[in-house]
């Protein structure tokens, strides 16, 4: 209990000390805030918040008592200075009184002296007023004189037609003089006459502008013709330059001569550059031959009259009416281009584009309608050329012509269909006039026109004249038609906005050759070829057409601006393959019919004879005579490769005919002598083939002999000592691969020795059988088993 009481006493002592220190801290804070001029609001709020305002009052009183001693010390320090200042003020009172009396005396003297001066000043002011009135009168008179001078000058300008200067005078009078004019009469006159003068000037320039609108219609027509003509001449120069370039490239490729290069100087003309002089006064002259001075004068006058926007709209409306009524497209828009660039804002680019869009829409509609009605390719080409020239002419002035070119491109297929139809008629007429005779050329120009121009020559050496060509007149006639088609197609495709159009030209050229010319030739072969000579001539023509087709594609590539290597890379097969094969098949068929006539002599052959014909059978001699005659004639017309194919077919037909005869009912039995006679016949065919050495190489001669390999192997089999070897697969593949086992069985049965038959065995019973016959019997038996 004692210890707890002791702790309480210590605690109360500590709390009392804490309260004293807190009060001292508050006094210090308040003193510091007052000294520093800080706000005492927080202290007041805190004090009232605790409910003890007497503490704050106690602190403030304590602070005031602490500052009283300081105030007393300050007063004691400055007491003597206050006393001295009061003494100084008392000493100044006497000086002030003396100064006041001196000022009063000076004022009296000044008033006495200034009285005469005031009267003089009044006189001066009166004189100045009179002078000012006189000056005003002189100024008014001078003003009126200047106004009258301007009026006189305006009248002179009006009389001389210098309306702009007259309006400038009127504007000067109105803005600078009329409000200041002192004469009411003169002012009323000016107010009445100035609007009349402006109205007069407006009427005069509107009349001049109306005359210009009438004149520019004729000028636009002539200007358009001149522009189109210039574009056409420029295109012609480009074509001539391209032709020279192609010739130079060809000569360089062939190394015929050294190439000579030169600069081609061309004068820059009005149309070529599309930019004229910048003289805004004449705005027309030069090569174009039209004057915009009346237009610009009217525009300038209306701007001076503050009617510029009205005149712009008036001009645009009139030009729009002229465009829809006259439709002079080229000249109209050349004029508008000049006005746009030199008119000083008379017409905006947007307005020109609006007029151009209107014209393009109308032209596209007209072209669509006209193209849909046209049934002649030449008419469509003429329209296309004119439209493309129009596009070239106006493109130089920055007009967009893509819509027009799209219309032309859209009718590309129709144009080519019409062109194909025209060429079909021309080719049909050319083929119907063909006499199937070799073409005779008497002069060198005929050779150049019919052979060299289409690169049909097989040698660079010019032949002697008269020259008989291996082809008939239909070949150059058809070549001219095809060349014209190519040139017309290129003409339509060029200058149309499409740079690479060779593929399009090639596509339609393929159609012309593959559909039109090929079908026409097929029809000619099927309806008009009735003899070997005619068939041979057609086959010869087809070989020449093969060279001509190479020229056609090269010519199309040249005209299209495509390098030959690229054109050769995209080449396809010969487009006249059908008619070429048909012509050769027709010739082969006719020759086979001729051969069949000679092969009927096989009926006269004694197939059971024991005598071998030393010079061959009659039918073979006749066939060889005909073949030799045929070759001697065909060599002059047919190319070697065509003649080889035809001869191979004929020889194969001879072989088939002989084998067919051996297998047929005509031959009942074959003797060894008959087989050896056939061997002689085949040897004659071998000799004939070998005699074709100038025409054939050794390899080709061996290939030619394969045409009658069937009859050769048949004879070799029948003459062999062991015909049974035929059934040996290895031997058959090596020596008898062209033989059919059924034919072998039939011929072997006929070739069997009659002594080996059933009735022949009675006379030879007990004798030994011939080994060859035994082998043949075994072959026949084996073949029967197979069948």
Curated annotation (Swiss-Prot):
An example Gene Ontology CC term for this record: plasmodesma
Main location, first listed in the record: cytoplasm
Annotated signal peptide: none
InterPro entries: EXOC6/Sec15, EXOC6/Sec15_C, EXOC6/Sec15_C_dom1, EXOC6_Sec15_N, EXOC6PINT-1/Sec15/Tip20_C_dom2
Biological process terms in GO annotation: acceptance of pollen; intracellular protein transport; pollen germination; pollen tube growth; vesicle tethering involved in exocytosis
Record has Secreted as a keyword: yes
Domain of life: Eukaryota
Entry keywords, A to Z: Cell wall, Cytoplasm, Cytoskeleton, Exocytosis, Secreted, Transport
Record's subcellular location: Cytoplasm, Cytosol; Cytoplasm, Cytoskeleton, Phragmoplast; Secreted, Cell wall; Secreted, Extracellular exosome
Family: Belongs to the SEC15 family.
Assembly and oligomerization: The exocyst complex is composed of SEC3, SEC5, SEC6, SEC8, SEC10, EXO70A1 and EXO84B. Interacts with EXO84B. Binds to EXO70H1 AND EXO70B2. Binds directly to B1L.
Function of the protein: Component of the exocyst complex involved in the docking of exocytic vesicles with fusion sites on the plasma membrane during regulated or polarized secretion. Involved in polarized cell growth and organ morphogenesis. During cytokinesis, involved in cell plate initiation, cell plate maturation and formation of new primary cell wall.
Name recorded for this polypeptide: Exocyst complex component SEC15B
Gene, per the UniProt record: SEC15B
């Amino acid at each position: 209990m004692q210890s707890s009481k002791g702790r309480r006493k210590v605690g109360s002592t500590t709390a009392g000390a804490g309260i004293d220190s807190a009060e001292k801290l508050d006094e210090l804070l308040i003193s510091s805030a007052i000294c520093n001029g800080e706000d005492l609001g927080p202290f007041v709020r805190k004090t009232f918040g605790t409910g003890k305002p007497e503490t704050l009052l106690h602190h403030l009183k304590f602070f005031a008592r602490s500052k009283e001693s300081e105030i007393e010390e300050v007063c004691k320090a400055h007491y003597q200075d206050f006393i001295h200042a009061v003494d100084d003020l008392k000493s100044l009172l006497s000086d002030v009184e003396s100064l006041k009396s001196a000022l009063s005396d000076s004022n009296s003297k000044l008033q006495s002296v200034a009285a005469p001066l005031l009267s003089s000043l009044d006189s001066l002011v009166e004189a100045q007023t009179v002078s000012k009135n006189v000056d005003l009168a002189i100024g008014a008179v001078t003003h009126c004189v200047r106004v009258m001078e301007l009026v006189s000058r305006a009248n002179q300008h009006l009389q001389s037609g210098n309306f702009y200067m007259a309006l400038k005078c009127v504007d000067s009078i109105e803005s600078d003089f009329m409000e200041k004019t002192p004469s009411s009469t003169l002012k009323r006159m000016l107010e009445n006459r100035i609007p009349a003068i402006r109205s007069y000037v407006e009427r005069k320039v509107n009349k001049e502008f109306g005359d210009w609108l009438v004149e520019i219609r004729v000028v636009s027509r002539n200007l358009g013709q001149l522009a189109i003509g210039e574009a056409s001449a420029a295109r012609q120069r480009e074509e001539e330059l391209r032709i020279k370039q192609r010739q130079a490239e060809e000569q360089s490729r062939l190394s015929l001569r050294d190439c000579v290069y030169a600069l081609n100087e061309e004068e820059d003309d009005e149309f070529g550059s599309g930019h004229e002089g910048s003289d805004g006064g004449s705005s027309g002259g030069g090569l174009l031959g039209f004057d915009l001075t009346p237009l610009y004068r009217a525009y300038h006058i209306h701007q001076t009259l503050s009617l510029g926007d009205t005149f712009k709209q008036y001009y645009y409306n009139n030009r729009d009416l002229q465009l829809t009524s006259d439709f002079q497209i080229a000249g109209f828009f050349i004029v508008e281009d000049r006005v746009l660039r030199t008119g000083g804002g008379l017409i905006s680019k947007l307005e020109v584009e609006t007029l151009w869009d209107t014209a393009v829409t109308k032209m596209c509609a007209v072209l669509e309608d006209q193209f849909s009605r046209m049934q002649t390719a030449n008419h469509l080409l003429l329209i296309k050329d004119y439209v493309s020239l129009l596009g070239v002419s106006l493109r130089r002035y920055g007009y967009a012509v893509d819509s027009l070119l799209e219309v032309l491109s859209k009718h590309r297929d129709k144009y080519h269909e019409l062109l194909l139809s025209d060429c079909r008629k021309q080719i049909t007429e050319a083929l119907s006039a063909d006499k199937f005779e070799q073409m005779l050329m008497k002069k060198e120009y005929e050779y150049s026109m019919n052979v060299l121009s289409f690169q049909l020559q097989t040698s660079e050496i010019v032949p002697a004249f008269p020259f008989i060509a291996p082809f008939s007149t239909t070949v150059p006639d058809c070549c001219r038609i095809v060349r014209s088609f190519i040139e017309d197609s290129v003409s339509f495709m060029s200058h149309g906005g499409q740079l690479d159009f060779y593929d399009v030209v090639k596509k339609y050229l393929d159609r012309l050759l593959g559909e039109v010319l090929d079908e026409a030739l097929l029809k000619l072969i099927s309806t008009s070829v009735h003899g070997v000579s005619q068939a041979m001539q057609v086959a010869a023509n087809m070989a020449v057409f093969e060279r001509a087709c190479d020229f056609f594609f090269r010519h199309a590539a040249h005209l299209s601006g495509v390098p030959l290597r690229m054109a050769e890379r995209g080449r396809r097969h010969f487009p006249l393959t059908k008619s070429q094969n048909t012509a050769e098949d027709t010739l082969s068929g006719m020759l086979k019919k001729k051969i069949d006539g000679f092969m009927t002599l096989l009926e006269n052959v004694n197939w059971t004879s024991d005598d071998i014909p030393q010079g061959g059978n009659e039918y073979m001699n006749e066939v060889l005579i005909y073949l030799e005659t045929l070759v001697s004639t065909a060599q002059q017309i047919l190319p070697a490769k065509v003649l080889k194919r035809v001869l191979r077919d004929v020889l194969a037909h001879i072989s088939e005919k002989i084998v067919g005869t051996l297998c047929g009912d005509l031959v009942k039995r074959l003797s060894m002598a008959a087989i050896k006679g056939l061997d002689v016949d085949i040897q004659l065919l071998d000799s004939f083939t070998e005699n074709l050495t100038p025409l054939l190489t050794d390899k080709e001669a061996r290939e030619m002999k394969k045409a009658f390999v069937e009859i050769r192997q048949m004879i070799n089999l029948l003459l062999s000592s062991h015909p049974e070897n035929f059934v040996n697969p290895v031997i058959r593949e090596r020596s008898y691969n062209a033989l059919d086992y059924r034919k072998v069985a039939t011929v072997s049965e006929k070739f069997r020795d009659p002594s080996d038959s059933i009735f022949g065995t009675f006379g030879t019973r007990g004798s030994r059988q011939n080994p060859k016959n035994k082998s043949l019997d075994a072959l026949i038996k084996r073949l029967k088993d197979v069948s």
